[in-house]
């Protein structure tokens, strides 16, 4: 995580650092555990030591954070790489790119109750699954279903 904070600091330092530079950082989701390092850096004064005044804004999903950066409303943001790929597919030439991978193995999961008979991927057939439409992990479900011989028409 220390390397990640150093990286974010170096990106933020690319902005003029002679006076306190105000910069907005768009999160992909609400203030939760994964965003703790950013707040830690603020609380410990790491950004301030570099003359940066960082404001962190909560998001509503990766497909909320990415357009904020692409339109210039925010100079930097945090988002799921799968959502960025989807965004760039729908918006070719958009001026946004990934500069660092934070999670090389994201913790995507399907949670099911054993008491309801969900113990293997194929047990999902006949069940109802829910995910928000812009969810980057949900985009992974079709290949997951295919790899596990799940008939998505039965879900």
PLM features: residue spans?
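Short, glycine-/small- and polar/acidic-enriched structural segments
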Residues: 22-155
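Sec/Tat signal peptide C-region and signal peptidase I cleavage site
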Residues: 15-19
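Bacterial N-terminal signal peptides
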Residues: 5-14
């Amino acid at each position: 995580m220390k390397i990640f904070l150093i990286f974010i600091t170096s990106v933020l330092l690319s902005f003029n650092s002679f006076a306190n530079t105000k910069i907005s950082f768009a999160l992909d989701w609400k203030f939760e555990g994964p965003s703790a390092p950013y707040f830690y850096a603020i609380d410990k004064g790491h950004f301030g030591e570099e003359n940066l005044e960082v404001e962190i804004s909560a998001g509503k999903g990766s497909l909320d954070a990415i357009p904020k950066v692409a339109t210039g409303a925010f100079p930097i943001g945090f988002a799921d790489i799968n959502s960025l790929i989807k965004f760039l597919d729908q918006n070719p030439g958009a001026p946004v790119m990934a500069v660092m991978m934070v999670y090389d193995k994201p913790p995507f999961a399907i949670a099911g109750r054993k008491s309801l008979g969900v113990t293997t991927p194929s047990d999902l057939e006949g069940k109802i699954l829910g995910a928000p439409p812009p969810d980057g992990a949900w985009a992974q479900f079709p290949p997951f279903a295919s790899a596990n011989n799940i008939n998505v028409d039965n879900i």
